[in-house]
Design a protein with these regions (language model features):
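Terminal-region recognition feature
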Residues: 1-150, 154-157, 161-163
Length: 163
């Protein structure tokens, strides 16, 4: 099927295909020595955001990725790739760390959007997304963002601001 002749629904079906590659495939294929880092140092960790330090052609980099599962169990663990505020705060913490140590940031975006539950709103979902967007625009380290599949709403924009 030629991509330009596809409807929006057909495009969505392709990017939601359960057997397509995810960050769990791309990270080990692209990077060496990936070490995952956890938590926002405020509330907790969020399995919808995978972040850490790796090497790319012997260059240290910071990797921040939205996680999408392949089955119900994996999707439940990653909240169906809908990050909570602590996920966005974790991403920003790692971006600040990358800037401090002069590491480029590589983000992988794949989300239908941020989690919109009451608890996420109580923990400052809107503020966390807005702060990520604003702060990523001022980082003094290179930022690359790759959209792997879905890029819905502010939940995607929070990791899509790049050079």
């Amino acid at each position: 099927m030629i991509m330009s002749n596809m409807t929006a629904t057909q495009h969505l079906e392709i990017i939601r295909e359960k057997n397509r590659p995810t960050v769990n495939d791309y990270i080990p294929a692209i990077f060496n020595h990936f070490t995952e880092l956890h938590g926002d140092r405020h509330y907790g960790d969020d399995a919808a955001i995978l972040s850490g330090i790796a090497t790319l052609n012997s260059t240290p980099v910071t990797v921040i990725a939205q996680v999408k599962g392949r089955n119900l169990e994996e999707n439940k663990k990653s909240n169906f790739s809908m990050p909570h505020p602590e996920g966005y705060r974790k991403a920003l913490r790692l971006a600040y760390q990358a800037e401090k140590f002069h590491r480029p940031v590589i983000c992988f975006v794949d989300t239908p959007g941020a989690f919109c539950g009451v608890e996420a709103e109580k923990r400052g979902q809107g503020e966390a997304i807005a702060k990520n967007i604003a702060e990523f625009m001022t980082l003094k380290t290179p930022v690359i963002s790759v959209v792997l599949g879905e890029g819905g709403s502010g939940g995607a924009l929070a990791l899509a601001v790049c050079d």
